[in-house]
């Protein structure tokens, strides 16, 4: 690594490392611009000639392939992206200083300074950390279970849709179970090494000895991206997981993570748009699905606006524009955005699939079951992420139809529900929580005379926090409440069976949510409390109890009854284990607890200020 002759051989036409680094960054910015204007193959073709010599070309090329793999979950895409990212990492290693930033991590005396690194070497460090992190993500994906052999195909085929054949072959693991555990451990090691590198680089940037080189905005942008991503992600984890990670050296600060990403997003670097996309994911997905539904939508719109102006037909930004409209409760506007996103490009079908998923939920919010079914059906035929979930949703929507509506589709919901368990896949040896939930709910259909689920589509809507969407529009909430009330009346009139209490409690949970958003607070509280009162009678849907406590706590928080809310949240966290969607519930409990404690602290400060005055 330290031999000058070897380094110079990496640069054609006698270029210096510094000039070649600047040129590489300019070219990668051009490729990124092509990508953001939906010219996906052109971006890859532009980058490919220098992927064997330039670490930035190699990393950017591999990143685009990884984005494709993340969207398709296809083993071919995962394998291809993994191999390319490994090559990028090896290339970064060739450019790194022999004594890297983490080599002396354990020594407080001999810790490195930036003066010991050339500009190229310090860029190699941040690119190396990025490769490690992205390879870790792919390692976790390599436990995906898909049918069919992995067939070689061209590197430049982003139009590839799901090639997984129908039938039980999808049950076979892409890797064996024990290999999945090895993959998981390897992925964890990569994450830790990446974390330590970013941590050291952040310390170097903050040091007084930091001297900025010609391409320092790109280097700093890379550090801010990594440090911000780690801090933000770690800060969201449930307390019990975070304590374990802190024991092995990890720590996360949400405010610092957001600050780093916001600074990275506001700069003019190669990674600025990556910081923007990560922040948009955080604001429009993570805090919404894994949080309380309180989203900083103004910040999301502020981040998106300049990119939507610059790339008005950019599929990525149109998609986020649709997500923002969903969260605001503007469902018709969201539908137009997602349809526009699909029309904007035809090359990467994976973007279409993301839009189909969102459109499925948009029509669910409107109670238009035929359109919801249509998009679930499209996903089940074209996308490999979770066949079990898609088929379950098809069955769920069919069960919401009137009997006269079934025939045109030629599907039978009972047969579809029965097919769900055979479509399960695994990632890193673990089943997807949504699939496990769908499989558990489908089990009742295996009896000779199955008892139907009362409102399966509206139950899954709760799992994805959809009531926080319809709650923005009283008309939508009224429509869903009417459906739930009819289901409640049918349960009351019907004969008692082994699922009666479970179904009644489910309906009360969903009814309570609608009543809450309609401002009928007392009625909502009564519905939530009735679930806890029937705790001992619930046989199967044990997830209802901690979630009822969570929803009751959120209701109390809106009334500034934060101390009561915290007690309920603590009970939900400590007293219930091994239920469906437990991790997602714990994420939401963590977010609610932090919000309640923050409100209490603000109230205390206000009281102290008023007393001092």
UniProtKB/Swiss-Prot annotation:
Keywords attached to this entry:
Repeat, TPR repeat
Domain of life per record: Eukaryota
Q: Where are the TPR repeats?
A: 315-348, 505-538, 546-579
Q: Give a yes or no for keyword Metal-binding in this entry.
A: no
**Organism (species):** Homo sapiens (Human)
Q: Which GO terms describe its cellular component?
A: centrosome
What protein am I looking at?
Answer: Tetratricopeptide repeat protein 39A
Entry similarity comment: Belongs to the TTC39 family.
């Amino acid at each position: 690594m330290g031999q000058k002759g070897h380094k110079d051989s990496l640069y054609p036409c006698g270029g210096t490392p510094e000039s070649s680094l600047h040129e590489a960054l300019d070219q990668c910015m051009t490729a990124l611009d092509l990508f953001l204007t939906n010219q996906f193959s052109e971006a890859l073709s532009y980058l490919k000639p220098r992927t064997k010599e330039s670490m930035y070309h190699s990393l950017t090329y591999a990143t685009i392939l990884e984005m494709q793999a993340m969207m398709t979950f296809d083993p071919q895409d995962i394998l291809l992206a993994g191999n390319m990212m490994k090559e990028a990492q090896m290339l970064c290693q060739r450019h790194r200083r022999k004594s890297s930033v983490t080599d002396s991590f354990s020594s407080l005396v001999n810790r490195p300074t930036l003066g010991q690194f050339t500009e190229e070497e310090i860029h190699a460090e941040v690119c190396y950390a990025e490769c490690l992190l992205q390879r870790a993500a792919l390692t976790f994906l390599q436990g995906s279970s898909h049918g069919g052999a992995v067939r070689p195909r061209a590197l430049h085929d982003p139009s590839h849709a799901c090639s997984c054949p129908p039938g039980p072959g999808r049950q076979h693991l892409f890797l064996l179970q024990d290999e999945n555990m090895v993959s998981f451990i390897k992925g964890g090691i990569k994450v830790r090494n990446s974390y330590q590198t970013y941590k050291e680089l952040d310390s170097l940037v903050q040091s007084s000895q930091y001297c900025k080189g010609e391409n320092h905005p790109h280097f700093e942008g890379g550090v801010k991206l990594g440090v911000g991503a780690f801090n933000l992600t770690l800060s969201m984890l449930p307390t019990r997981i975070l304590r374990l990670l802190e024991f092995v050296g990890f720590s996360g600060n949400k405010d610092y993570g957001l600050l780093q990403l916001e600074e990275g997003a506001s700069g003019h670097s190669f990674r600025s748009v990556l910081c923007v996309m990560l922040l948009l994911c955080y604001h429009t997905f993570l805090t919404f699905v894994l949080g309380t539904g309180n989203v900083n939508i103004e910040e999301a719109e502020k981040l998106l606006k300049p990119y939507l102006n610059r790339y008005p037909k950019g599929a990525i930004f149109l998609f986020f524009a649709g997500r923002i409209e969903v969260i605001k409760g503007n469902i018709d506007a969201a539908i137009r955005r997602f349809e526009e996103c699909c029309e904007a490009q035809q090359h990467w079908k994976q973007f279409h699939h993301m839009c189909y998923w969102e459109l499925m939920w948009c029509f669910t919010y409107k109670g238009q079951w035929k359109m919801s079914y249509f998009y679930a059906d499209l996903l089940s035929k074209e996308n490999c992420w979770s066949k079990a979930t898609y088929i379950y949703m098809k069955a769920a929507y069919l069960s919401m139809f009137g009997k006269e509506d079934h025939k045109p589709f030629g599907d039978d919901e009972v047969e579809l529900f029965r097919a769900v368990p055979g479509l399960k896949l695994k990632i890193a040896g673990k089943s997807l929580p949504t699939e496990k939930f769908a499989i558990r709910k489908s089990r009742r259909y295996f009896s000779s005379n199955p008892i139907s689920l009362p409102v399966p589509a509206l139950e899954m809507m709760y799992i994805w926090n959809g009531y926080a969407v319809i709650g923005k529009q009283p008309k939508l909430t009224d429509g869903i409440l009417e459906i739930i009330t009819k289901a409640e009346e049918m349960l009351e009139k019907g004969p008692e069976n082994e699922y009666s209490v479970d179904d009644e409690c489910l309906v009360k949970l969903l009814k309570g949510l609608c009543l809450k958003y309609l401002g009928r607070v007392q009625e909502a509280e009564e519905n939530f409390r009735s679930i806890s009162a029937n705790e001992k009678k619930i046989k199967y849907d044990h997830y209802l109890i901690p979630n009822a406590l969570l929803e009751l706590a959120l209701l109390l928080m809106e009334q500034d009854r934060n101390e009561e809310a915290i007690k309920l949240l603590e009970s939900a966290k400590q007293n219930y284990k091994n239920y469906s969607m437990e991790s997602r519930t714990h994420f939401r409990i963590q977010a609610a607890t932090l919000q309640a404690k923050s409100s209490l602290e603000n109230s205390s400060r206000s009281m102290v200020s008023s007393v001092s005055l």
